[in-house]
A protein has these predicted regions:
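Membrane-interface aromatic/basic loop that binds lipid-linked glycans or pyrophosphate carriers
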Residues: 270-334
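Cell-envelope/extracellular polymer assembly enzymes that use nucleotide-activated donors
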Residues: 2-5, 33, 187
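Glycine-rich, basic loop-to-helix element that forms the pyrophosphate-binding segment
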Residues: 64-81, 88
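Short, well-formed alpha-helical segments that are part of the catalytic scaffolds
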Residues: 12-26
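A conserved acidic beta->alpha catalytic loop
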Residues: 23, 38-47, 66
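Donor-binding/catalytic cores of nucleotide-activated saccharide
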Residues: 91-198, 209, 213-218
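Short beta-strand/loop segment that forms part of the nucleotide-sugar
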Residues: 31-40, 60-64, 90-91
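Nucleotide-sugar-dependent glycosyltransferase catalytic core
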Residues: 180-182, 189, 198-229, 233, ...
Length: 334
């Protein structure tokens, strides 16, 4: 059994895949396996994976017949893994050479710690140099060790980030949430924190490559799947006695997200096909209907533009579109 399994879900990642794999194969901790699953890429990603696997037996490669989304792809990788500890690295990101060693050492020596966060560095593209040397540390709340429940609470609004190494048993018990093609992996982070006795940090760096092609920045319909992912997390929080105190805070987050995503739709609906418009409106309506009004704070429901108006979906839509029109006119006058 290797000390660490690194899960890498790959989809059309040939541009940055070499940098990712090189950073993993050059780790100071050698007792590792790198489990790469190609999610039916249409570029040269699979060929690159096979090229690297032929040179280093620590790299395992599998491929999916059809595109299945990042959570399912990671679950396939998780099922292939055998390491004592598990972490994931996105195929366009990279690690400092000591990242796996430092995080594994914490888990080896701190028996009550089940999860170790990396030092999260955001690498932004310098358009002049064409490099990712513009780097900044994620603004995470500093801590040494905290309970898993506290970490779950802090991750609801990302006061701590979600990039970590975890003990294998926990990850197998709670695989990646597949309730949504995107964003549901964020739910898994919160569940992993909740399932951990204690959560710690290490100095090993995870470099997140922020660029226009990143899944979280792509100008497409993926953002609306956050509504599905949030519903799944709500169900989890409601189903455990020790997380129910978080339900009201999270429900207010959900409500603000519904309004924010309606605004996104208001700005872009003309660019969508009729089928896409119907899909977005269906998701927005389902989320609007599912909000538990008893959990919402009055400051988030009494303002124009934020009143649920549960008696009528049409009335709610009319309120939103008038509110967004007035807001746009106000912004133009500034």
């Amino acid at each position: 059994m290797p000390k660490v399994s690194v899960l890498v879900a790959v989809y059309n990642a040939e541009k940055h895949l070499r940098a990712c794999l090189d950073s993993l194969l050059n780790q100071s901790l050698k007792d590792i396996e790198i489990v790469c699953v190609d999610d039916a890429s249409t570029d040269n990603s699979l060929a690159l994976l096979n090229e690297y696997a032929a040179k280093d037996e620590r790299l395992k490669v599998a491929t999916l017949a059809e595109n299945s989304g990042i959570s399912h792809t990671r679950n396939v990788a998780l099922g292939m893994s055998t390491g004592e500890y598990v972490c994931m690295v996105d195929s366009d990101d990279w690690l400092s050479a000591d990242a796996l060693q430092l995080s594994a050492e914490v888990l080896d020596t701190e028996q009550e710690v089940d999860c170790v966060l990396f030092d999260f560095i955001i690498a932004e593209r310098d358009d002049v140099q064409g490099t990712y040397t513009r780097q900044r540390r994620y603004n995470s709340m500093p801590f040494c060790r905290i309970s898993g429940l506290r970490a779950c609470e802090l991750s609801l609004d990302w006061r701590i980030h979600g990039l970590y190494m975890i003990r294998r048993a926990i990850h197998l018990q709670y695989p990646y949430d597949e309730s949504s093609p995107v964003y549901s992996d964020e739910n898994t982070t919160r569940v992993h924190y909740w399932a951990s006795r204690e959560v710690a940090q290490c100095a090993g760096k995870y470099f997140y490559r922020q660029h226009a092609e990143s899944a979280t920045h792509a100008p497409n319909l993926n953002k609306y799947y956050r509504l599905d992912a949030y519903k799944s997390l709500k169900q989890f929080l409601q189903s455990h006695a020790d997380t129910r105190f978080l339900c009201a805070r999270f429900e207010n987050m959900r409500w603000l997200t519904v309004v924010d995503l309606y605004y996104e739709y208001y700005k872009t609906w003309r660019q969508l096909s009729r089928t896409e418009q119907q899909m977005v409106k269906k998701r927005l309506k389902a989320a609007w209907q599912d909000i538990d009004l008893s959990l919402l704070s009055s400051k988030d429901t009494r303002k124009f533009g934020y009143m649920p108006l549960r008696f009528s979906w049409l009335a709610f839509r009319m309120q939103e579109e008038l509110y967004f029109f007035v807001r746009a006119m106000r912004d133009k006058m500034r």
